[in-house]
Amino acid sequence: MTDMYSLFVAFVLGVVEGLTEFLPVSSTGHMIIVGELLGFTGDKAKTFEVIIQLGSILAVVVVFWRRLFGLIGIHFGKVPHEGKTNGHLTLGHILLAMIPAVGLGLAFHDVIKSLFNPQSVMYALVAGGLLLLAAEWFKPKNPKATGLDDITYRQAFAIGCFQCLALWPGFSRSGATISGGMLVGVNRYAASEFSFILAVPMMLGASGLDLYKSLHFLSWGDLPMFAVGFITAFVVALIAIKTFLSLIKRISFVPFAIYRFIVAAAVYWVFM
């Protein structure tokens, strides 16, 4: 039987997941920290996190559904061309960007799992913040790729290499990929869109594998809690994605870097 506190925990973590999954601040880091503060840890908590991540993924699918279906050859009307070249974003770009992190993730799965703790997250928050600053300070003044369809295969693979940094819990997958994109000549907005689209197969694969391994932790009694978390994460992520894409046309990533440093300091104060 799910009690009211469990539903409260589900709602809070759903908000945290939806709000942070696609911002360059690390959803995993925030989920670990908030989970520790709420006393919601262990195998059941990990299974819950997988479920609500699926809610965030669904939000990306809703926002980019035309582009996603277009990648697999299913077209619903004409998708606007984004960029100044005659190129097109293809499934090949996404697959190339997936290879580095998938390979490294499978090879070092156990090592990565051992890093899911507040101390490791604290260091990753700082490192990810420094990368955001580096992306803003050292990005090309005139990016070659001004839209999604300008991104080359080489740039896609390079972004995939940066994505490997996100295997460190607390680093931020979106932070790593967007920063990487900016450093290799993709403008901030296009890099963000590419990061969100890339998140769908990456997160579906990782979440699907984790869910398969965690099926025995699921019970019908937990269904209300999981439903609250899933729906909350979906709604909040939908709002966060649209708001973020609007904001980055006007602001840099410096505020996000500063926020990461503040959270890292808070983690040190609370957990160290």
Curated annotation (Swiss-Prot):
GO-annotated cellular components: plasma membrane
Topological type in the membrane: Multi-pass membrane protein
UniProt-listed Enzyme Commission number(s): 3.6.1.27
Swiss-Prot/TrEMBL keywords: Antibiotic resistance, Cell inner membrane, Cell membrane, Cell shape, Cell wall biogenesis/degradation, Hydrolase, Membrane, Peptidoglycan synthesis, Transmembrane, Transmembrane helix
GO terms, molecular function: undecaprenyl-diphosphatase activity
Reaction it catalyzes: di-trans,octa-cis-undecaprenyl diphosphate + H2O = di-trans,octa-cis-undecaprenyl phosphate + phosphate + H(+)
InterPro entries in UniProt: UppP (IPR003824)
Family annotation (Pfam families): BacA
Location of this chain's protein in the cell: Cell inner membrane
Enzyme class: hydrolase
General remark: Bacitracin is thought to be involved in the inhibition of peptidoglycan synthesis by sequestering undecaprenyl diphosphate, thereby reducing the pool of lipid carrier available.
Protein purpose: Catalyzes the dephosphorylation of undecaprenyl diphosphate (UPP). Confers resistance to bacitracin.
Protein name per its UniProtKB record: Undecaprenyl-diphosphatase
Biological source species: Yersinia enterocolitica serotype O:8 / biotype 1B (strain NCTC 13174 / 8081)
